[in-house]
Amino acid sequence: MINKIHHLQDVNNEMLAYYFNDLKSDTTIFFFGGYSSDMTGTKATALNNWTESNGINYLRFDYSGHGQSSGDLSEGTISKWLGEAEFFFEKFKSKKNIIIGSSMGGWIALLTALKNIDINGLIGIASAPDFTKNEWDK
């Protein structure tokens, strides 16, 4: 299946790139990528192939300053990227929702789950909660 990339403008006027396969499933899997990663990475595309093979809705996106989204990476913050993840979650959630977060995306997934009862599953892949403290202390 051809993956057509779309863009949505968020509350910060960023044009955020995303792909949603909308297979009319009652389950949606969301992929939250890591710092400086984009939605064309190995994990994101492998999940895309698996969800399409199994008839499950799938949303992947680029945070501002990442991949095909607008913005400057150096102006990003965890709070800003959390808001972007929540923006997509609210727009594309279904009856059952599973978030898979990789690295920084695992941290953002945890923060999203703390604020939202519509999440039925959470998977962290090499989750990096509070990785910024270690990076800035160097």
Indicate residue ranges for each PLM-predicted region:
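N-terminal cap/lid segment of alpha/beta-hydrolase-fold proteins
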Residues: 1-24
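Short beta-strand immediately N-terminal to the catalytic nucleophile in serine-hydrolase-like folds
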Residues: 99-101, 125
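Gly/Ala-rich beta-loop-alpha elbow adjacent to hydrolase catalytic centers
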Residues: 101-109
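Catalytic nucleophile-loop/oxyanion-hole region of alpha/beta-hydrolase
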Residues: 66-92
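Short substrate-entry loop that stabilizes the transition state in hydrolases
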Residues: 35-42
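Conserved alpha/beta-hydrolase
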Residues: 44-70
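Short beta-strand element of the alpha/beta-hydrolase
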Residues: 26-34
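Hydrolase active-site cap/lid region
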Residues: 115-138
